[in-house]
Amino acid sequence: MVDWSTLPEELLHFIAARSFSLVEYKRFSSICVSWHSSVSGVKKNPFHRRPLIDFNPIAPSETLLEDHVFSCNPGAFLSRAAFFRVTLSSSPSKGWIIKSDMDTNSGRFHLLNPLSRFPLRISSESLDLLDFTVSEIQESYAVLKDAKGRLPNPGYQRSALVKVKEGDDHHHGILGIGRDGTINYWNGNVLNGFKQMGHHFSDIIVHKGVTYVLDSKGIVWCINSDLEMSRYETSLDENMTNGCRRYYMRFVDCCGELYVIKRLPKENSRKRKSTLFQFSRTAGFKVYKIDKELAKWVEVKTLGDNAFVMATDTCFSVLAHEYYGCLPNSIYFIEDLEPKVFQLDNGNGSSITRKSESSESSFEMFFPSFL
């Protein structure tokens, strides 16, 4: 067996420099003494000597959705949130999901509700990376009204980080779906309405380096680095999107393939005012993917061991057996601030379970006991 602690220091520097997140960098330094020494020192390692992630506790005056009081400070702010799989280092087969963004001034992590962007009240002040293994599994971006608030800018209810060509160079910018269904582009200074060809848009995703947007008619569009739109070769059939309104359809990447989730409302959506969090009650979901042989979108009857996590700012898939309490062939979502899970029809009919109605074991992966 290879003794990893004896790797050359030059190689360790090479590995550490390519850590894709701050958490991975900290995890690297906690593996063994020689690895920690290779990145120690003020110039090499700007972090604490003890490999901790420090959480930023929420003060009682902090703005939360349920408080119904929101800051109105001027200045839009780009927030990157990350989803992490956390396991006990001694038992890595199953884990939990936590979500955080970072305070730009202190460098401390804000823990967020995994299904929304609102803060969690926690009792723990830190997470010891000697006891836990933390791996980033998904990221999401939001243009917030201000740096302290948690409300997205109305023009960016769904957002994606994209590379945009400016002359001979490429720069990062944000494409977002507005509350009115329009597409907007933000480069950190300018909010611009995006000239578009489709109907009201519902979601946006960067999949395998290509930016896709989905409109309320089920038409999929591609946006290139010149911010030019073109219609994707395959769109959802009209009967798949009949009666669907914007925000009722979402993209999700599962095992490298692109899926569309359609939310089915219980009542006529026109009877209620639709906002980001207030829809008609959900009756269920339908899932679609592209059949490459038929060259069309087809309904997916089972997700197998996969579960979809449909957060307010992004959607992604996980393998159910890798997380505590996670139900396979299911979709986790939030409605009226309450976590819910929809189980696709497995022969016994489909069903929706609310966290308050269950033993909570089905939602255990979102609420780890160590926080």
Curated annotation (Swiss-Prot):
S-S pairs: none
Xref: InterPro entries: KIB1-4_b-propeller (IPR005174), SCF_F-box_domain (IPR051304)
Domain F-box stretches: 2-49
Highest taxon in the source lineage: Eukaryota
Protein name: Probable F-box protein At1g65740
